[in-house]
Amino acid sequence: MKRFLAISVMAVFLMAFAACNEEEHDGAGPRRGNYFVTVLTGPTSGIFFPIGGAFSSHLRHIGYRTSVTATGATVENIRFILSGQGEMAIAMSDAVIQAIQAYGAFEGQSPATELRAMMGLWPNYVQIVTVEGSGIKSFEDMRGRRIGVGAPNSGVELNARMMFEAHGMTYADANVDFLSYGQAIEQMRNGLIDAAFVTSGLGNATIRELSANNNVAFVPVEGEGLRRLLELYPFFIESHIPAYIYGTAADTPTVSVMNIMLVSDTLPSNVVYDILESVYSEEGMETISASHSNALNHIMLSTALRGISGTVIPFHDGAVEFYRSRGMMN
């Protein structure tokens, strides 16, 4: 009897062990309820938050335990992922590259080689917003003016710093305020700021609010400053802000950089594969596309590799397996 009991206990143990191994094996569907996925986004006034919230909602719907967290956006999200405070995070690809190569905002830190990408999202446009009558019609016109450059070490502020550098200027050439773009535009509404950097998708809600009672204008990124910027930081993409987006007089030349979804390297490959398979399903796309026009226009399987392929940013193994199964990777 004791021998039979011992054999029975051992059999149960082996079955449980085999089940665990099966769950971690590539291609096996994960037990979704066993995983808690925190999605790191950005300020509630920006675009990261509603789109990240849609990802969290969809994950909850299909059985994952999940939450969405408002943050300071890109740089904070990268640090939270690295410290284990989140499993998925929206971030601008330029800042991810800086973290991996330990320069810019990550100067002096160890290269963040454990960062992993899951998918490309939508382009972030550098929108240097002002109002008509401010006297700011070129980047150089911001000399000596009050400029909101983003919260310290945020993705917006990193872009502002690179823009100043490309135009042969530093923050010392202007009166800069380290404010989030929501705060900066509120200050502009009150006449306390002359221009503000807003790096986000087009149709930003805070700029739309400003345009309700002001004739907004954008500082162009063009000429020698643009040439130098693309030479220094080739991850930027030459772009423009269409006039119809905010009702400006004409299209404005600028640059953009892709947002991507980072994923913790501690998540098993089959979980990442499962998330991607579900996100790119008809139901997943319907939920995410409804969150914002930028999600509707840009987040789709055909753009999944954009902003990641050809850079130093590695994909998570589960993402590699998924894209290979779709014939998108060798």
Q: Which positions does each model-derived feature cover?
A:
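C-terminal motif of bacterial Sec signal peptides marking the signal peptidase cleavage site
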Residues: 15-19
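An extracytoplasmic/periplasmic, membrane-proximal ligand-sensing/linker region
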Residues: 37, 179, 183, 190, ...
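Bilobed "Venus flytrap"/periplasmic-binding protein-like clamshell domains
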Residues: 34-62, 66, 124-190, 309, ...
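N-terminal (or domain-start) structured segment
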Residues: 27-92, 98
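Pocket-lining segment of extracytoplasmic ligand-binding domains
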Residues: 93-95, 103-104, 170-262, 266-267
